[in-house]
């Protein structure tokens, strides 16, 4: 469910769930959770019809599961690389695509998108 109340309902099994948007029915406050912002970023840079590209993350110097990446390309040749740092510390990394290179620093617990335009 994209929207749930502060207790994670309503749902059909009576357990507690999270959602992109949570609403406190008592105070009428709306909370946009981190997953809302992640989905928002993905939906702006990965569109229907885009193709997923093979990505490789060389993270042998990092804790397991600290760094994740996925890339896509659209019909205009724009490549979007989504990078997620799940660790508690910033990570400086290089991103290479053919002749394009970028060195970026990922803040702790952050998602970042970098884009390359192959048409340029």
What is the predicted role of each segment?
Residues 1-120:
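Substrate-binding and catalytic surfaces of secreted/luminal carbohydrate-active proteins
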């Amino acid at each position: 469910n994209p929207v749930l109340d502060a207790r994670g309902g309503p749902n059909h099994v009576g357990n507690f769930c999270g959602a992109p948007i949570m609403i406190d029915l008592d105070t009428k406050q709306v909370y946009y959770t981190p997953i809302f912002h992640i989905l928002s970023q993905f939906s702006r840079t990965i569109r229907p019809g885009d193709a997923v590209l093979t990505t490789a993350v060389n993270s042998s110097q990092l804790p397991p599961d600290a760094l994740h990446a996925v890339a896509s390309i659209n019909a205009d040749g724009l490549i979007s690389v989504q990078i997620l740092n799940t660790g508690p510390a910033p990570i400086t990394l290089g991103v290479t695509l053919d002749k394009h290179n970028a060195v970026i620093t990922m803040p702790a617990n952050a998602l970042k998108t970098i884009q390359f335009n192959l048409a340029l």
